[in-house]
Amino acid sequence: MENFNLMAEGFDTDKRLDRAKIIANKIKSHIVDGHKKTAMEYGCGTGLVGLQLEDVFNKLLLVDSSAEMINQVKLKLSKHNNPNIKAYCCDLMVNAPELHHVDYIFLSLVMHHIMNTKEFLCRLHSLLNDSGRLLVVDIDSEDGGFHAKYPDFQGHNGYEHSYLTDLAAEAGFRKSAVETFYHDIKMFNGQESPYSLFIFEAVK
């Protein structure tokens, strides 16, 4: 398994930065009246995606279960004063102090690490205001090559679109839509593993 506390300090590679810019722009294209809204990014890591959206929302909460990832976020925040951004270290499946009543929740390459997807979607649903929106960027179903570097990876090898749509309905979301928008290749031990990313939007 990836140890995100150990990965935090060197997490911001050029590859991740480039991909995060594309993801942030895609998420931004789904935001309506963001300047009036409160948003939360869960699994924010070092803030690669979320901090690119800091001017989009009225208030932004950056949340991660890794203390070291949040330390990296706080270090970045200390270098430019934006009182509308707050960073929290917590596991949403255990506790979520001060995180209720948000208009948007967005996640990038996070959900496939969480075993019980339906339970997680139910939890996110409970944190949204009525008509709030969930935006999930994650991996299309693949053969496991994305995590080939981690042989004991215990999450999901991506998702089928129809599976997520059905789970979202079961979790209480009124409507949802999904589209693939990004294609790339991961290399490990000289082996190429093509993968693609989708954005999934669900409305409470």
PLM regions and their residue ranges:
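A short glycine-rich, Lys/Arg-flanked "PGG" loop and its adjoining helix->strand segment in the class I
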Residues: E119-D130
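A conserved beta-strand element that flanks and buttresses the S-adenosyl-L-methionine
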Residues: F106
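Conserved class I S-adenosyl-L-methionine
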Residues: M1-G34, V49, Q72, K79
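C-terminal alpha-helical "lid/dimerization" subdomain adjacent to the S-adenosyl-L-methionine
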Residues: D12-D18, M40, L135-I199
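Short catalytic micro-motifs in class I SAM-dependent methyltransferases
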Residues: L109-V110
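C-terminal lobe and adjacent flexible extensions of AdoMet/dcAdoMet transferase-like proteins
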Residues: F200-K204
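Class I SAM-dependent methyltransferase SAM/SAH-binding core
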Residues: M40-V94
